UniProtKB/Swiss-Prot annotation:
This is 23.5 kDa heat shock protein, mitochondrial. Belongs to the small heat shock protein (HSP20) family. It comes from Arabidopsis thaliana (Mouse-ear cress). It comes from the Eukaryota. It is found in: Mitochondrion. InterPro entries: A-crystallin/Hsp20_dom (IPR002068), HSP14.7/HSP23.5/HSP23.6-like (IPR044656), HSP20-like_chaperone (IPR008978). Keywords: Mitochondrion, Stress response, Transit peptide. The gene is HSP23.5. GO terms for cellular component: mitochondrion. Residues 1-20 form a transit peptide.
Length: 210
């Protein structure tokens, strides 16, 4: 009986077709940086040197993934509230807060948004693009930002190249959309959207008392 059991065990171990449970199969990990920093470029900070690198665009797009959605510049439309909520969540992460907006890998976000008392401030990294390559437009309450540069010789044209498109939906009666200012300098786009004052928002007209 013992010899027959040992023989059966040898046959099992020598078999080349042993079924492996799904739970034990190796799963290829997804790099966190590719999910959290899907922009035209990310900046690596090493010894105080600012270096530009193109990021990996092959990002997993599982439905409902908040972080990949909010950081993807090719998402059709994102709301301002989503962007501000994301910034609040990031600021609560000790490591990110300590590195001033950089993740554990030392990579800075490709965009930033700050809401102050008087205006909304946007910063978007668009490396390789000049002021002439960037166009901003307002479609009802949606701010549309487009950038497209000429492809240099030897540059891969099969991907997105130097193209950037983003649509940010602004809430109604909060910002002075007719006073939006934009500045493009050194591959960085800065947009300032003034806020409507509280009394202007509520159509309040103050009357002087003689």
């Amino acid at each position: 009986m013992a010899s027959s059991s040992a023989l059966a065990l040898r046959r099992l171990l020598s078999s080349s077709t042993v079924a492996v449970p799904r739970a034990l199969r190796a799963v290829r990990p997804v790099a966190a940086s590719s999910r959290l920093f899907n922009t035209n470029a990310a900046r690596n900070y090493e010894d105080g040197v600012d270096r530009n690198h193109h990021s990996n665009r092959h990002v997993s797009r599982h439905g409902g993934d908040f972080f990949s959605h909010i950081l993807d510049p090719f998402t059709p439309t994102r709301s301002l509230s989503q962007m501000l909520n994301f910034m609040d969540q990031v600021s609560e992460i000790p490591l990110v807060s300590a590195t001033r907006g950089m993740g554990a890998s030392g990579v800075r976000r490709g965009w930033n948004v700050k809401e102050k008392d008087d205006a909304l401030h946007l910063r978007i990294d668009m490396p390789g693009l000049s002021r002439e390559d960037v166009k901003l437009a307002l479609e009802q309450n949606t701010l549309v930002i487009r950038g497209e540069g000429e492809t240099e010789e030897g540059e891969d044209v099969s991907g997105d190249g130097r193209r950037f498109t983003s649509r940010i939906e602004l809430p109604e009666k909060v910002y002075k959309t007719d006073e939006i200012k934009a500045e493009m300098k050194n591959g960085v786009l800065k947009v300032v959207i003034p806020k409507i004052k509280e009394d202007e928002r509520n159509n309040i007209r103050h009357i002087n008392v003689d």
